[in-house]
């Protein structure tokens, strides 16, 4: 997957997430405003009925109701954020699983180059079974021989290499997605919600 394709995919996912999150946030804000207005209305009614006697209690009650409304608002927003982020990550996982939007051979070349930086002479390479023909071609192009190719359905794609003495570099899509997750979550939080 080249940088341009990654950027296009990233932009599309961000745009979809932005639209969905704005809609969810608008609805949550309307609901929060309604709850706060209702709380303030209740407070005013109580204050008018027993002006001096209950004004202190009414303010405390109003504050509790407003605090609860704000808490519910924060919960709603947090759920909306989590939902949007999970949908983005799920879409990325689907695209990786189905090999949508990128060149698998180029992807494997780049991942192998990165892994070879840490282990120059791997003895084993673990791949998704669908990538067998691609990795054979890549290994041949790089002049790498005597490497055991192990197929595993436990990885979406990408590769894991191991040295003869047990050193391991995990450059599988699963691991890269997890590594990217914390970075993406922080970036999405800033982009979508300004925090």
Swiss-Prot record:
SUPFAM superfamilies: F1F0 ATP synthase subunit B, membrane domain (SSF81573), V-type ATPase subunit E-like (SSF160527). GO terms for cellular component: plasma membrane; proton-transporting two-sector ATPase complex, catalytic domain. It holds the Pfam family vATP-synt_E. Keywords: ATP synthesis, Cell membrane, Hydrogen ion transport, Ion transport, Membrane, Transport. Signal peptide: none annotated. It is a peripheral membrane protein. One of its GO terms (molecular function) is proton-transporting ATP synthase activity, rotational mechanism. It is found in: Cell membrane. One of its GO terms (biological process) is proton motive force-driven plasma membrane ATP synthesis. It comes from the Archaea. Has multiple subunits with at least A(3), B(3), C, D, E, F, H, I and proteolipid K(x). Belongs to the V-ATPase E subunit family. Component of the A-type ATP synthase that produces ATP from ADP in the presence of a proton gradient across the membrane. This is A-type ATP synthase subunit E. The gene is atpE.
